[in-house]
Amino acid sequence: ADISAVDFNTVGTYTAVISVKDGSGNETREEVSVVVQDPSASLNSGSTVTVGTDFGSYSSEYVPFGFGSEVDENNRPTGLQWYINRYGKYTADFIQPESNYIYLTMDEGYEYGLTEGILDTLKEKNVKAVFFITLPYAKQNPELVQRMIDEGHVVGNHSVTHPSAGLSTLSVEQQINEVKEVNDYVLEHFGYQMYLFRFPTGAFSEQSLAIVQSQGYRSVFWSFAYKDWVVDEQPDVASSLANALNKVHGGAIYLLHAESTTNASMLADFIDGCRAKGFEFGYYSKVD
């Protein structure tokens, strides 16, 4: 067989030539396709991750995240389908399947004294959320992180430094470290294995998604967000609540920032309003 054209270090489809001689010495040659894939391993969740990956084979092109205002008949943003079609294979969620469940996620970069009250509200309303934390947050707020875990919330990985230009602007080694250092710290100090990752700013690349997947993580984006992260420019509570309720949809992934006084103020009414519309809050489990 002639396999000289096959590069076993690079993912792709190649052509090899196989030759066979019969008893009379007649030779038959045939071209066959050889597919080189990333080695993979199955997680307990049932998902598959790449291992020993040559991340250079993935596109590092910067991909911003945004999906516009168009919605379908069920109020679900139609702009998300573009991302699902292209990147969903990297165990990435942009929205959950249509159902009466919605998923509440909160990003924690810095603590502004609001998380304790948010946790109180969630406990009172019997809602489990996902809190995406950075490494500095975990180090500076161990009591809050422990409470999140103790009260049954999911603690997700939001990178070490929250690079403002996006994770994909870093080197492969730096990106791996941004995920791994948070993972290892939380596991060591809290005995908690994280399994969800949120990209800082939402920007990513195909390569970044593959890197996060290779670390055993599911990437979680969102189907609702609004400008709530500027601490000194908080939006009006009433209009923000109306906006959040008007855009509710089955399978929604809500992104709220925990440093927002508006979010802290409207959270209880938001939960009640969603339930009044027939929705319930789901738990973001490891199962795909």
Regions found by a protein language model. Give the residues of each.
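A glycine-rich, coil/turn loop motif that links secondary-structure elements
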Residues: S4-F8, F197-G202
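Extracellular interdomain linker/stem segments of modular secreted and single-pass surface proteins
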Residues: V35-L43
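Active-site beta->alpha N-cap acidic-glycine motif
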Residues: G56, Y62-L167, Q175-E188, Y192-M194, ...
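Alpha-helical scaffold elements lining the catalytic groove of polysaccharide deacetylases
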Residues: L114-G117, P163-F190, A203-G250, T262-D269
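Catalytic grooves of carbohydrate-active enzymes
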Residues: K247-S285
